[in-house]
Amino acid sequence: MKNTKLLLAIATSAALLTGCQNTHGIDTNMAISSGLNAYKAATLSDADAKAIANEGCAEMDSGNQVASKSSKYGKRLAKIAKALGNNINGTPVNYKVYMTSDVNAWAMANGCVRVYSGLMDMMNDNEIEGVLGHELGHVALGHSLAEMKASYAIVAARDAISATSGVASQLSRSQLGDIAEGAINAKYSRDKESEADDFSFDLLKKRGISTQGLVGSFEKLASLDGGRTQSMFDSHPPSTERAQHIRDRIASGK
């Protein structure tokens, strides 16, 4: 019964998409005709989703200039990573810097954390700790895993891929890149963003890191809300509101 309802929901969603095109450039008629494949993708196991994240992260790394460990960015990130830890709820975490002026950072379900040099130029280490704590929150709370599955479902519908065990090894580099891009560009709900903010606050306190950096990061990102478009918080709730929420938590001591 549960699977029948899921298949019906996918078919209904596909029908509602008629006349529209999503960010992956999928023809909606193709999406409708591939409803069964989307259903299979929706039942993708957590293990396969994380395997796809592993391959997708590697594909993203290959398409970007990664800062060396000996560079000023690499050394700064190593210090930040040591403070935050290399394991989140049992998931190993690895950190790298992409050399690009974009202001962004993201994390995938497999613990792949990437921060852009544009963000590091804009913020101090404590502020970056706050931002990365937020991204780790999406991993720990299952948000990243859900988005990886959703992104896979979209590409599966487009390319008629079935969700068989070990599917990651069957995907092309182009498909992996599309899935990864879809996952890291996900627009989370306000509730999920707030949950990740609170996770970051709690993580910083647990690790003995100042929570003021989280406030500072929001204040700096607030300056981008009405200007530059390539910001990690373009689709997030207003940064000013988020900064105030963290101030309130600091004041309450909780």
Give short role names for the model-derived ranges:
Residues 2-8, 18-254:
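A Zn2+-metalloprotease active-site environment signal
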